[in-house]
Amino acid sequence: DHQIPSEEFDVKGVLSAKAARIVPKALYVARVTRYDILWTVNMLAREVTRWSAACDRRLHRLICYMHQTSEHAQINFVGDAPSECWLTLFSDASFAGDLRDSKSTSGGILCLVGPNTYVPICWICKKQGAVSHSTAEAEVISLDAGVRLEGLPALSLWSLVIDVFEPEAKPKQPKLELSLHERLLLRRQAHDIFGSVDFVPPSLPICYGRGKLFILEDNDSVIKMIVKGRSPNLRHVGRTHRVDLDWLFERINNDPACFVKWVGTKEQLGDILTK
């Protein structure tokens, strides 16, 4: 964007009439397989109703990049049992990356990892709704979105997969007895989703405890805030950011299946989804 002449942002683009047909196709590709172009496509999608000559230049660059990398393939491999695999969430953020309103961008990618397994499952790229005061605040918001929208739902599903396909390895756990109404509701939901209710047990464990979620963050300050919780020194943190921080502290520290670890910037896979 810094290399695009400023006057092009105020001139209507040549492709303004076709942008609404081109961008959704690129967005579909980015959501299904090409997570490396998701940030660019999201940026173009926000400009569909106000398409400018600068957007023409961005779209041309995107099409050229996709053409040059059309023969590249994503290599995935699975060689382990479900109980031997774990989930890894890479979370990152670009501080004040938007030139118009100085808002940051959240990015994250969730992978299934094992000794002989590596499969990217889903990814997210989202512009934050509030302006952050620092990189740490922006990454807290990104981490909250990744854990809430990707990490925890996938952890629940993967724990269920392990229990269904490897029931003989299931450890003994305390049971939570359900009422008749709760059992009927679970069976109805299972029938709607899977078309069968055979796998629904008469009682559910309090927590499966076999699936694990490793959250990888490249900012030491964010990790310390999550592990120690919010302190009075963070008085400048806004209400929304404060709720996100408290929720992460409570969720990660009280859940034995969630772990936060540091990862180097070069190994941070979520970086490509933020810029």
Annotate each language-model stretch with its function.
Residues 64-94, 194-205, 209:
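Structured nucleic-acid-interacting core domains from mobile-element enzymes and related host factors
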Residues 15, 26-27, 74-78, 95-99, ...:
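Generic recognition of flexible, low-complexity loop/linker segments
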Residues 14-19, 33, 51-54, 82-83, ...:
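Secondary-structure capping and boundary motifs in well-ordered enzyme cores
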Residues 47-50, 129-275:
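RNase H-like nuclease module associated with reverse transcription
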Residues 40, 98-100, 224-225, 271:
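Short helix/loop capping segments that flank catalytic or ligand/cofactor-binding pockets
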Residues 1-74, 264:
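C-terminal reverse transcriptase regions that engage the nucleic-acid substrate
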Residues 34, 40, 107-110, 270-274:
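Short, conserved catalytic/metal-binding micro-motifs enriched in Asp/Glu and His
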Residues 86-136, 243:
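RNase H-like nuclease fold core
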